[in-house]
Amino acid sequence: MLSLLSDNWRLVLSMVLALLIGWNIRVPVFKMAILKNFVDKPNKRSSHTGCVPNSGGIVVFLAFLCSFLLFVRFDSRPEFQYVLLGAILIFLVGIYDDLLEISPRKKVKGEMLGVLVLIVGGGFYLTNLHGFLSFYEISPWVGIPLTFVGLVGLINAINLIDGIDGLCSGMAMIDCIFFGIWFYYCGHIEYALMCGGLTAALIPFFLINLFGKRSKMFMGDSGALMVGFLLGVMAIRFCETDINLKGICAVEAAPGVVFSVLAIPV
């Protein structure tokens, strides 16, 4: 099926599917959250007065997952199976925290497990800083710890900004669009599909989070942690760019560019 579609059609259809799934499941997920008392209750630090469903992350995750599974060619990107497994693990950690409010230590341990699956299983880590701070090629002894700390830190940074309506999802969409356009023009189509799918999956949540009244939902840790993880994957892949590429794909000091793109959460 995928072999019959051009890369452009795969990209368009993956985004359309993620958008449609997110839009159509938002109401059932909202009702399920109310029924199961899966809500964020107001406290002294809350800006909302009533109980708001904490299930927006479920909408984003399911929409992205369906798009990712149906349109990405895993045979061309073997590391994607570990990206998917890591994202699922971190999503489940977030769901568990949203429901039971686990300790920060346990939550971070779960995040670390998801990141380790990606690094160890997928061999996915930094190998070159492209002149950032005058460093170029780095050994795995440096690249693996740097990737590990960077991913765990970014996951929690994204989670921390998920306190204002539309901020986390809005920033994530901007970052995804930047990375997605770059991946597309540089020929990294599978990563462009990941960026496009996540952007489209975030749109329905962004609208109901920012403009919803009776159907308002929060993203919750399940969504924020998973989005942070996927943004980290995009950032690492961006940093692993071939420094000899020309035109729009040529990136000097790629980690510095990543810091600029992710400036607000970081």
Language-model regions: role of each:
Residues E137-T147, E252-G256:
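Membrane-interfacial loop-to-helix junctions in multi-pass transporters
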Residues L2-M32, N37, F61-I88, L92, ...:
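Alpha-helical transmembrane segments
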Residues I88-V93, G110, G114-Y125, L146-N156, ...:
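Membrane-embedded alpha-helical core segments of multi-pass
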Residues P53-L69, L116-G121:
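A generic, lipid-embedded transmembrane alpha helix
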Residues L2-L5, F30-F61, I95-L113, F135-S139, ...:
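Interhelical loop and helix-boundary elements at the membrane-water interface
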Residues R45-S47, A87-L89, P145-L146, L151-G153, ...:
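Short hydrophobic "helix-edge" motifs at membrane interfaces and signal-peptide entry regions
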Residues V39-T49, S67-R77, L126-Y136, V152-I161, ...:
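Short juxtamembrane and helix-loop transition motifs at transmembrane-helix boundaries
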Residues N128-P140, L245-A250:
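Interhelical loops and loop-helix junctions of multi-pass membrane transporters/channels
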